[in-house]
Regions:
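Conserved phosphotransfer microenvironments
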Residues: 47-67, 85
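Non-catalytic signal-transmission and effector/linker regions of two-component phosphorelay proteins
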Residues: 1-28, 32-43, 96-107
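ATP/nucleotide-binding catalytic cores
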Residues: 38-45, 63, 67, 93
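A short helix->loop->beta-strand "cap" motif at the edges of active sites that frequently abuts
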Residues: 69-75
Length: 107
């Protein structure tokens, strides 16, 4: 994994990144299974993006995995339209805070 990595998408195979804000070498999209092979995460990593849930994992698992790996940046969780977004956000943030992560949620 690039030492200049700034943005990492996990479990979003069709992720695209805004250029020129993020250069191609500063972004990557991987599966959760591939994450272990990319440890330790580079200090340049500013943002991790992951889905609320998918076939392989859910947001709570990502929070635990990143926290255990020592990541202390921003985790942005992508969600479908939710009936009560605030309840989900509150629950995820309570877990993220215990792991030292800042959490954002976006539809």
């Amino acid at each position: 994994m690039s030492k200049t990595l700034r943005c990492l998408a996990i479990g979003i195979p069709t992720a695209s990144f805004a250029e020129p804000t993020i250069r191609p070498e500063e972004a990557a999209s991987i599966t959760l299974a591939d994450l272990a092979g990319h440890m330790p995460l580079p200090d340049s990593l500013e943002l991790v993006v992951a889905p609320l849930f998918c076939a392989d994992f859910d947001a709570l698992e990502i929070i635990e995995t990143l926290g255990s790996a020592g990541y202390r940046g921003v985790l942005r969780i992508m969600t479908p339209k939710l009936p009560n977004r605030q309840i989900v956000l509150r629950e995820l943030r309570s877990h993220a805070v215990r792991q030292g992560l800042s959490l954002e949620m976006q539809e």
